[in-house]
């Protein structure tokens, strides 16, 4: 099997199957041979693990995962890719392709069916345009997984790894911190991919917490509050929450002050615990 990161082979493979990379699917294939082992190292995957991969492309990361893990199940939405993967993954017995949209798949059922008795990890080179919805589904569905290790745009990685209460925090930062601990592992230059994106990429590892970081009575309401707070970044938390939730500003301001905060506080200055306090006072 030729090296899947060899650009001449990638071109020949795409030409053989009349395959044109799709901007709509955010396809950027890995062409840096040192990158797949580094990603798998960061994931901590070994022969005990079942691995759920999202967006295998032509199988560059997939082959490395299959070398290290007990089993790899890759979810792919592009119906043109199976013939290419049939060639590049030929002879890899612990690999299975699921041709579905990851946002529509019952992942709990899939994991139960494909990985009985195994610890499970997610490892993926995610399409940049849909990073947040995929991460939120993987976390919010409370899947029986130990970790998520994802290659994403550096800007998105900064948000995924940011601690709530810091300048870089956002709604997705709060969600990640609620469900997991996160760490930026390393960056990858644009030339590591074909076609080369215009931005630097980065790998983030998220380790799932056994229980959420804070206890809230109404999780759906909690995240609605967080999303509202960050929905208008240049506004104070009071203004943004009032606007986002359709509540009187006076009531929101009173709740924020009753929770012990200055009414002019910005959302990025609030921690998970702070949001929980504000939600509790709003609910009274």
Tell where the protein language model's regions lie, with residue ranges:
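A short C-terminal helix-loop "cap" of Rossmann-like NAD(P)-dependent dehydrogenase/epimerase domains
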Residues: 253-255
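Catalytic cores of RNA-modifying enzymes
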Residues: 1-220, 224-228, 257, 268, ...
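An accessory alpha-helical subdomain
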Residues: 202, 206-208, 214-251, 262, ...
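Short, flexible active-site recognition loops that position polar ligands and cofactors
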Residues: 263-269
């Amino acid at each position: 099997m030729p090296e899947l990161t060899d650009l001449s082979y990638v071109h020949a493979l795409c030409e053989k199957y009349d395959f044109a990379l799709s901007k709509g699917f955010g396809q950027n294939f890995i062409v840096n041979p040192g990158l797949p082992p580094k990603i798998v190292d960061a994931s901590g995957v070994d022969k005990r693990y079942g691995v759920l991969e999202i967006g295998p492309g032509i199988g560059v990361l997939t082959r490395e995962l299959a070398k290290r893990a007990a089993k790899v199940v890759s979810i792919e939405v592009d119906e043109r890719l199976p013939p290419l993967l049939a060639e590049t993954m030929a002879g890899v017995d612990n690999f299975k392709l699921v041709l579905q949209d990851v946002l529509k798949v019952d992942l709990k059922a899939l994991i139960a069916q494909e990985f009985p008795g195994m610890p499970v990890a997610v490892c993926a080179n995610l399409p940049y345009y849909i990073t947040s919805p995929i991460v939120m589904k993987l976390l919010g569905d409370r899947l029986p997984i130990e970790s998520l290790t994802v290659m994403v745009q550096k800007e998105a990685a900064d948000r995924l790894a940011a601690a709530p209460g810091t300048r870089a925090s956002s709604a997705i930062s709060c969600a990640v911190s609620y469900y997991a601990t996160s760490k930026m592992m390393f960056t990858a230059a644009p030339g590591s991919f074909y076609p080369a994106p215009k931005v630097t990429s980065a790998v983030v590892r998220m380790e799932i917490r056994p229980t959420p970081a804070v206890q809230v009575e109404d999780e759906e309401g909690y995240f609605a509050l967080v999303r509202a707070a960050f929905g208008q970044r240049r506004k104070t938390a009071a203004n943004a929450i009032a606007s986002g939730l359709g509540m009187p500003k006076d009531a929101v301001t009173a709740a924020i002050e009753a929770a012990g905060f200055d009414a002019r506080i910005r959302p990025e200055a609030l921690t998970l615990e702070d949001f929980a306090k504000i939600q509790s006072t709003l609910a009274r």
